[in-house]
Amino acid sequence: MRSANARYTMTIFSPGNMSLPIVSYQAGLHLNLLVSGLFIQQKCLGYQQWLQRNWPVDTPETGTQRSTSMITIDTGTDELLCHIDDRVAVITLNKPHKKNALGDILTPALRNTLLLVEQDDRVGCVMITGSGDAFCSGGDVSGMGASPGQPRSTQERIAELTLKQETLTLRLYELDKITVAALPGAAAGAGLSIALACDLRVAAKRAFVTTAFRNIGLSGDYGGSWFLPRLIGLARAKELYYTAQRVSSEQAVQLGLVNRVFDDETFREDAQAYASEIANGPSGALSRMKVNLNQGLDQGLRESLVLEARHLVESGNSNEAQEAITAFMEKRPPIFHTDL
């Protein structure tokens, strides 16, 4: 069910001026009018220019298929971009001049955007990525030494950080959609925690990951110490935390941190295709699979069997299952979605 608070707008961007909203457009028209911008020397680059650089629509000469009917979601800030393409909600951390570091503008926008795309029936998969040559460098270290305007007790600070973590990485981990972290480059600190909270991770060859916390004298946050041992085992997770070593994309695949590695030159297209395959699958069944797998880590076999039985009966009664059976009988691929 789509949130009433979601605002879908198309805008014209004029460098140096404010974006001008367009509230209607002719269906099927190839639009070059999209919202937001890319920080370059602390100025904004038009979203369409960013899109052409990072998510190019292939021409007939390339021989590949890409949708041109993308829908832009207004995140409320140029530091976070979001569009829906082929049922994939692509959320882009957009502070390349700071390696997409988290901050007081970007992070709240990310929390809110996750809620919007989760409630949008046109979204079958959520992919989080970063502008430029990084995924996310974690918290903005340049602002960590700033003194707070109002003194707070230790307990108040703990409660605040706990809430921030729960509304970001816990929300991401429990999201009703399948999530993919697409790493064009470095994922460090809390940025790595965000990637680990996703169901799947794909990386460019040049990408690397690092816990990084020891380098700034911090113990870690946003759930990395919970996610990492479940992916690679406790001993290896401890080593990565204690040493903050850089793990290349190829090493990350061997460890089980990353699912796929794509060439740098075609990374964004390959990541989009990877997410699109998931997004166009049976969303209800995939969501139930996610719950089965996540809960199975922390419950006994008996409880998992009961959960699987309930979800199998529910999915068996769904339109998705009926379409799959019909498609099998008609010897054609199933079509689970016709909304985009």
List each language-model region with its residue ranges:
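Terminal peptide-recognition signature
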Residues: I91, K95, L110, I128, ...
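Low-acidity, Ser/Thr- and Arg-rich intrinsically disordered low-complexity segments
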Residues: R2-T9, S14, S19, S24
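Crotonase-fold acyl-CoA enzyme core
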Residues: D104, L170-L286, V313-T326, E330-R332, ...
